[in-house]
Amino acid sequence: MDLLIENARLVSMERGEAGYLPTPPARVGIQAGKIAAISAHPVGRDTPQIEALLSPQHYSQTIDLQGQLLTPGLIDCHTHLIYAGNRANEFEMRLNGVPYQEIAKQGGGILSSVKATRAATEEQLIELALPRLDGLLASGVTSVEVKSGYGLTLKDELKMLRAAKALEQERNVKITTTLLAAHALPPEFEGRADDYIEHVCQEIIPIVAEENLATSVDVFCESIGFNLEQTEKVFATAKLYGLHVKGHTEQLSNLGGTELTARYKGLSADHIEYLDEDGVVALSKSDTVATLLPGAFYFLRETQLPPIELLRKYHVPMAIATDVNPGTSPFSDLTLMMNMACTLFRLTPQEALRGVTQHAATALGYTNSRGVIKTGFDADLAIWDIEHPADLSYQVGAKRLVGRIVNGEYVSHGGF
């Protein structure tokens, strides 16, 4: 798709403060799904080379944004979008004072979703996921990470990953899949966590890698999940098969999972409410992103805040994601998460936008192809009818998305 965008106030997110401030009316040329040229100068006032690249004769479609805001497409770098079942009853239990850990010990929580997901077909899982995905797309999302983890058998984990990848055929969006077989201990392995981890490493990871069903492997490293030794075994196996690693770490306690994730050069360590300074230092010495999940923090009514000031002090990149899931974050709006990150965690609007663009791209391994508006990068963009990028964090509920561009293809969300 060849597309020329004119009169866009560009928020590139490329270079610090400058990349956050909207440019004067700019032009962006898109060819073969990539950004071919950018100019913030009036027509005829840029270099001859840039003017030639942006000549309308090279493009089959032109869109005049008339001063509307153009940002990178938003990236949701942590979701559990594929699942069956309903856990609204647990919401009431928590409101009555039953803690999440106790619900899980009673066989609720993740395992109730496991039962429903195992009973669903791949086609049913796709249909159930589409409304959730549509909510994300309506908030400007162009890339979504989707985890497995509600199957916990080889057959059902593969089913979930195939359903996730199939979403690309249903909607104009990029899907990245992550194996999260080490999400919870399935009933068949009750009391035998080491045996289950052996099963994950010997039976599930090799098939997932062979069939190219995931690019990363994640582990729920927590007191009600898997310990450090078990997590490390999964990480080591994933690396052996050429897969990236990610961690659900320090959500409910400090086990050192974040430091382990950083040691294995993980793409991201997610949740991190109980992360201490040693863990932050470990992140700062790696390329591992700290992913904040304010939806789960809010929904669980947690009080332990992630160490935002330490993350700033040590210059650790912070991503933000929805954590869409049936038990602890049933939210499908990434701009709502931006607002929560600002109001609950005290991020700035600039940090929030960078957290769902540049840093979210890094958390998925796309540092050099997504998350900023830059020549040579993927043409994944969002068009907004707003005055300033801070409005994305400030306003909640107002319909502000005009359209999305994915791989250079324009999709209207009420504009043009």
Swiss-Prot record:
GO terms for molecular function: imidazolonepropionase activity; iron ion binding; zinc ion binding. Keywords: Cytoplasm, Histidine metabolism, Hydrolase, Iron, Metal-binding, Zinc. Coiled coil: none annotated. SUPFAM superfamilies: Composite domain of metallo-dependent hydrolases (SSF51338), Metallo-dependent hydrolases (SSF51556). Its cofactor is Zn(2+); Fe(3+). GO terms for cellular component: cytoplasm. Transmembrane segments: none annotated. N-formimidoyl-L-glutamate binds at Y150, N325, G327. Zn(2+) binds at H78, H80, H248, D323. Its EC number is 3.5.2.7. InterPro entries: Amidohydro-rel, HutI, Metal-dep_hydrolase_composite, Metal_Hydrolase. It is found in: Cytoplasm. It comes from the Bacteria. 4-imidazolone-5-propanoate binds at R87, Y150, H183, Q251, T328. One of its GO terms (biological process) is L-histidine catabolic process to glutamate and formate. Disulfide bonds: none annotated. Pathway: Amino-acid degradation; L-histidine degradation into L-glutamate; N-formimidoyl-L-glutamate from L-histidine: step 3/3. Binds 1 zinc or iron ion per subunit. Fe(3+) binds at H78, H80, H248, D323. The keyword Kinase does not apply. Belongs to the metallo-dependent hydrolases superfamily. HutI family. Catalyzes the hydrolytic cleavage of the carbon-nitrogen bond in imidazolone-5-propanoate to yield N-formimidoyl-L-glutamate. It is the third step in the universal histidine degradation pathway. This is Imidazolonepropionase. It comes from Vibrio parahaemolyticus serotype O3:K6 (strain RIMD 2210633).
